[in-house]
Design a protein with these regions (language model features):
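Membrane-interface loop-to-helix entry segments
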Residues: 21, 38-45, 51-60, 64-114, ...
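Extracellular/periplasmic helix-exit of transmembrane alpha-helices
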Residues: 93-111, 122-128, 162, 176, ...
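Conserved small/polar residues in nucleotide/adenosyl-binding loops
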Residues: 315-321
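Helix-loop-helix module between adjacent transmembrane segments
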Residues: 5-39, 43-67, 233-243, 262
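Membrane-interface alpha-helices at helix entry/exit sites of multi-pass transporters
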Residues: 12-19, 165-178, 261-266
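Flexible loop linkers connecting adjacent transmembrane helices
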Residues: 1-11, 199, 203-222, 248-257
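Helix-loop junctions at the membrane interface of multi-pass solute transporters
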Residues: 67, 144-149, 155-167, 174-178
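Select transmembrane alpha-helical segments in multipass membrane proteins
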Residues: 12-27, 58, 123-147, 184-186, ...
Length: 325
């Protein structure tokens, strides 16, 4: 928010954009950072263990409030343990799926390429784009943003609390998040689906498997019932860590709007309640709300990125930084 406030030559314009960004960040924290994650946890546990969504929502809401009441130190400690655990679980699982079905990998990749570039798909995609191009772009961009949050400016809020004297070094470290999320995690997910042979399979109702149900089928085909448990646990850890991290980002935006930190208790309470609502609401409503919030949040941040591009280039060239691994 303060970057936006000071980035523009006209301070009043910067202040307006900073306030708008803070408002949209608070809304996005309830949407993408909270409700969609709670919905993913509830779906995974319902499909795998048959747990009622209301029960899952209550547990998520209670645990969220208990963690965030401890402040940034408690949030940092929880995510410090959750993130490595979820990464190891998921990377191990997808790696084993690819290794076990490695002989199917070439045909699986070929199936993806043929499905994307065959004449029927190209004709259908072209007609669909001509008829509803904006909707096609909307889904493509929104899912990409949901994957790595690039362009939203949310990660900068968390990076700002890092104890480092060098902004360039911190910027390099923050950039790795997009690479890990999209190139590593998403690529392994796609390769696991391609090699498992579950791509294009249908459920008992005749519907194509997709999303969480597809990945559960992929893990189940390799590990059996244990694979379903492994994936459900991975999704729960991924999603809960995201809920906790986004709470801090939304709280800082709320604090900027309120002018002090005394009123953040109301935000924390509402945040825990929305985690419950996300678990019990329909998936379509949750996604629509999240997409709107993400789009609104990105606009002022991207304006600041353009305005500060020369300053960033100058800082990068004049202040070389050695990254210590």
């Amino acid at each position: 928010m303060y970057v936006l406030q000071n980035a523009f030559p006209y301070r009043r314009m910067g202040r307006i954009l900073a306030v708008l960004f803070a408002i949209f960040a608070v809304l996005a924290s309830f949407g993408m950072g909270n409700m969609t994650q709670g919905n993913s946890i509830a779906e995974a546990l319902a499909v795998t263990f048959g747990v009622d969504r209301t029960v899952t929502g209550l547990v998520i809401g209670i645990f969220t409030i208990l963690v965030i009441l401890g402040g940034i130190d408690k949030i940092a400690r929880v995510t410090e343990y959750l993130v490595p655990c979820m990464a190891v679980f998921y990377l191990f699982g997808t790696g084993m799926v690819i290794f076990t079905h490695f002989h199917n990998l070439p045909s699986g990749i070929l199936q993806i390429l043929c499905g994307a570039f065959c004449p029927e798909a190209m004709a259908g995609g072209s007609i669909g784009f001509l008829c509803s191009g904006r909707q096609a772009m909307r889904y493509g961009v929104s899912r990409g943003v949901f994957s790595n949050e690039a362009g939203l400016g949310a990660a900068g809020i968390s990076a700002a609390c890092a104890d480092t004297p060098d902004a360039v070094r911190q910027g390099y470290i923050s950039m790795t998040g997009v690479f890990i999320d999209t190139i590593v995690i998403c690529s392994l997910t796609g390769l696991a689906i391609a090699s498992s042979g579950m791509l294009g399979q249908r459920d008992a109702q005749g519907e194509l498997l997709n999303g969480t149900a597809l990945m559960i089928a992929v893990f189940s085909a390799t590990f059996g019932r244990a694979g379903e448990w492994m994936l459900a646990l991975s999704i729960a850890l991924f999603a809960f860590a995201t809920i906790i991290a986004w709470e801090y980002q939304g709280e800082k935006a709320f604090e900027y709007l309120a002018g002090n930190s005394r009123r953040t208790g109301w935000y924390r309470l509402c945040y825990g309640m929305f985690a419950f609502f996300g678990a019990v609401c329909s998936l379509e409503a949750v996604w629509d709300f999240s997409d709107i919030c993400n789009g609104l949040m990105a606009v002022p941040n991207l304006l600041a990125v353009v305005m500060l591009s020369q300053a960033v280039s100058y800082t990068h060239l004049t202040l070389p930084t050695k990254l210590e691994v």
